[in-house]
Amino acid sequence: MYVRHLGLRDFRSWAHADLELGPGRTVFVGPNGFGKTNIIEALWYSATLGSHRVGTDAPLIRAGADRAVISTIVVNDGRECAVDLEIAAGRANKARLNRSPVRSTREVIGVLRAVLFAPEDLALVRGDPADRRRYLDDLATLRRPTIAGVRADYDKVLRQRTALLKSVSGARFRGDRGALDTLDVWDSRLAQHGAELMAARIDLVRLLAPEVEKAYQLLAPESRSAAIAYRASMDAFVAADDAAPDRVTLEEGLLAALAARRDAELERGVCLVGPHRDDLELRLGDQPAKGFASHGESWSMAVALRLAAFALLRADGSEPVLLLDDVFAELDAARRTALARVAESAEQVLVTAAVLEDIPSGWDARKVHIDLRDSADGRVSVVQS
């Protein structure tokens, strides 16, 4: 799989861009702040419908514009597929697949399968559980695009149940049985969709665990062994080598946990149980990586998680595109060498770097120089001719 063409309209600092790409390695070179990362961000958005830098779409639209457009042509096993995404301010985003409109933007997920390495990856180890949940969900969705619908259904039920908790927090004191019966209905829906999302995550962690261990050993052979496990908010800890619980068991566990925490939830007006509060636990030896790993160990764990994702996507039979956003500048020589070795085997690698010296020596790569210029549209990113 590779991206043959990337077009941008009013995306971040790019008023207009048409980039012809191909298999092999391409390096986007330019000073920081000139728009290199915006290219990688656009490709990642095309793959996942999300940015690795911000949680909302508004910052993706260039100042003064009312929408941004990302257009890609992806070649997979000799077949081309065109994806056009329109990111709109204040209204629903739109998508086209091979120039035909689709009902939901989620229908384009899976066309481009990519693995992103970025400086923000350190948050996978040192950041909040939300960063690790997003890592799992993005990867699960790339492997099984229907998971995007599962996530959307769960998030919708979670919002509605949380709103109900806030509105009926006094119902138990007033004896309003009807309001509490309504909460029972939403408990059931939350457990149903939550169990489906948890099952997908747990299955993914079981597949990731040996790949993470292997990748970490490659990156840091002198360090402690690495391990991952899924820790659920319903007082359940699911190690990677445990038998995967089925959806029925997970649903029953969620219902029981919701019943046990109901008083606390009504008192606080928030949902305290569910996959939105779960975590991917990362361990080095017998200690959690967060809080105990050194800077080098943290980077090794973060890169190992991405390498494991690459291995899983490749094992599925479709070579993912590697996106490396200024990551070589963050790594020491040993980790750069290990990552470069993996990158050399990929069908397409798209890299950003402030200076060419950040790129591994001996790499045969096409260089694309990025500049920032004043225009009628303000200061915009351009490709040097």
Curated annotation (Swiss-Prot):
It holds the Pfam family SMC_N. The keyword Cytoplasm applies. One of its GO terms (molecular function) is ATP binding. InterPro entries: DNA-binding_RecF, DNA-binding_RecF_CS, P-loop_NTPase, RecF/RecN/SMC_N, RecF_2. GO terms for cellular component: cytoplasm. Keywords: ATP-binding, Cytoplasm, DNA damage, DNA repair, DNA replication, DNA-binding, Nucleotide-binding, SOS response. The keyword Nucleotide-binding applies. It comes from the Bacteria. It is found in: Cytoplasm. ATP binds at residues 30-37. HAMAP family: RecF (MF_00365). PANTHER family: DNA REPLICATION AND REPAIR PROTEIN RECF. Belongs to the RecF family. The RecF protein is involved in DNA metabolism; it is required for DNA replication and normal SOS inducibility. RecF binds preferentially to single-stranded, linear DNA. It also seems to bind ATP. NCBIfam families: recf. This is DNA replication and repair protein RecF. It comes from Mycobacterium marinum (strain ATCC BAA-535 / M). The lineage of its organism: Bacteria, Bacillati, Actinomycetota, Actinomycetes, Mycobacteriales. The gene is recF.
